[in-house]
Design a protein with these regions (language model features):
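Residue-level detector of Asp-centered blade-edge/turn motifs that repeat once per structural unit
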Residues: 23-27, 66-69, 109-111, 164-166, ...
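Residue position within the beta-strands of beta-propeller blades
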Residues: 31-32, 74, 116-117, 171, ...
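Residue-level signature of beta-propeller blades and closely related beta-rich strand-turn architectures
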Residues: 35-36, 78, 120, 174-176, ...
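Short, conserved, GDST-rich strand-edge loop motifs in beta-rich repeat architectures
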Residues: 117-131, 171-192, 248-259
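Short loop/turn segments immediately following beta-strands, especially the blade-tip
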Residues: 139, 186, 198-204, 246-262, ...
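Surface-exposed loop and turn segments in beta-propeller and other repeat-based domains
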Residues: 144-153, 201-219, 256-289, 329-344
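The canonical Cys-X-X-Cys-His
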Residues: 354-366
Length: 381
């Protein structure tokens, strides 16, 4: 695409939907494609011509080039593994067992470590606590050196982003309130949409903040990024059809004060209650409708934010303040097909009370389970 997002300059057709891509020092792009027999493509960075094509596990979900190991690292979702691949030979050098369904990763500690987000809890649904865990992999030793559990009920982790100084990581996921009766949705009674903050120096969870307000859900958070100036966190809320824009500087100032016991908003009761407080981001977060359906991916440059509306096949651009929105249709919208329209409705929280959740909130990943032990009302409480 052109730098303003209004013109397609190069195009390539691949075997299946793209899950992720990375760039190596030569400028070539490495792309992993979805499917039980996943594929990894090497593309010319300028012409997008295919340089190589390699089979790559069961649903390769993310890919990164590491300047430390000078190799590619690929999360293999349904192998529950992280693979190291030699870009010259495209052979697998290392396989590392990690958590349940890894879907995203980001480098930190001077690019010597990877923080990996696993999509689902791996413990039995009768356990307590039950939550998604993050893996820390040390690249030089090629070992898992730590695990970080998110709050009880955390599930469907989708994305991880790290600030420029690699001080904090941000992970999108849900917190399901599965221990409560499923008799209402008000104030996130059943599910809340969450951004967890990881202290990368201490290698532990700092806290989790809710993207929602008390009266509105920011359903199905998908991709998260930190803008190049480190001033904003942008989350694509795919279910509520919007971007959530957070003042990152103000967020960390507020967290520091809250940890000292200050009442930083009228709703804050205590530090430990922040993951339950839908008012914590009041005044430092706003919502930007993308005017389409299914914003899943988001990226920022020095002066623009771009997001992709999955179901309406649009690239959306806007200023860093969320203004001057422009859209460019990239192909036949998925929503125009019968299957695509059904999938769109399944993931659409705007047809739910106050946008709190979509069908995919409890049944993520093509209508599968969320790994939690719900007590539904159909057979009594």
């Amino acid at each position: 695409m052109s730098s303003d997002g209004q013109k397609a300059e190069q195009k390539v057709t691949l075997s299946s939907p793209v899950n992720a891509m990375t760039q190596d020092p030569s400028g070539n792009l490495w792309v992993v494609c979805d499917g039980n027999t996943g594929m990894m493509y090497e593309l010319d960075g300028k012409k997008l011509s295919v340089q190589s094509k390699t089979k790559s596990g069961a649903t390769p979900s993310d890919i990164l080039y590491s300047p430390v190991s000078k190799s590619l690292w690929v999360t293999q979702r349904f192998n529950n593994e992280l693979w190291e691949i030699d870009p010259a030979t495209r052979k697998v050098k290392t396989k590392i067992a990690i958590g349940r369904e890894p879907v995203a990763m980001a480098p930190f500690a001077g690019d010597s470590c990877l923080l990996i987000a696993n999509n689902l809890p791996e413990m039995p649904s009768t356990a307590y606590p039950i939550a998604v865990q993050l893996d820390i992999v040390d690249i030089p030793s090629k070992k898992v050196t730590g695990r970080i559990m998110l709050p009880n009920g955390a599930t469907d982790a989708k994305s991880v982003a790290v600030d420029k100084n690699q001080t904090y990581a941000y992970v999108t996921h849900l917190i399901a309130r599965y221990q409560l009766p499923t008799n209402q949705l008000d104030r996130g009674w059943m599910a809340t949409n969450t951004l967890s903050i990881i202290d990368l120096k201490a290698r532990k969870l700092l806290t989790s903040v809710l993207l929602d307000t008390p009266q509105k859900g920011a359903a199905n958070p998908w991709s998260v990024i930190v803008t190049p100036d480190d001033k904003q966190i942008i989350v694509a809320a795919a279910g509520s059809q919007e971007l959530v824009r957070i003042d990152r500087i103000a967020l960390h100032e507020r967290l520091a004060k809250a940890k000292q016991g200050e009442m930083v908003t009228p709703s804050v009761k205590s530090w430990n209650n922040i993951p339950n407080d839908a008012g914590f981001l009041y005044g430092i977060r706003d919502f930007i409708p993308t005017q389409g359906k299914g914003p899943r991916s988001v990226v920022a440059t020095g002066d623009k934010i771009f997001t992709a509306n999955y179901y309406t096949s649009e690239l959306v651009s806007m200023d860093l303040n969320g203004k001057n929105l422009k859209k460019q249709v990239l192909g036949a919208p998925l929503a125009f097909t019968k299957v695509g329209k059904g999938d769109m409705y399944f993931h659409d929280a705007t047809i739910c009370f106050q946008n709190w959740q979509s069908c995919a909130t409890c049944h993520p990943n093509d209508a599968r389970m969320d790994g939690l032990n719900w007590d539904l009302l159909n057979d009594g409480m």
